[in-house]
Amino acid sequence: GCRQCGGGCNKHGKCINGKCKCY
């Protein structure tokens, strides 16, 4: 899995299939 998703996504991120996706 992924940890602290959204830290580098301007606090807008989602963990999908073990990867952090920004939106």
Swiss-Prot record:
The modification Tyrosine amide is found at Y23. Expressed by the venom gland. Contains 3 disulfide bonds. Keywords: Amidation, Disulfide bond, Ion channel impairing toxin, Neurotoxin, Potassium channel impairing toxin, Secreted, Toxin, Voltage-gated potassium channel impairing toxin. Coiled coil: none annotated. GO terms for molecular function: potassium channel regulator activity; toxin activity. The keyword Calcium does not apply. Belongs to the short scorpion toxin superfamily. Potassium channel inhibitor family. May block voltage-gated potassium channels (Kv). This is Peptide 2412.
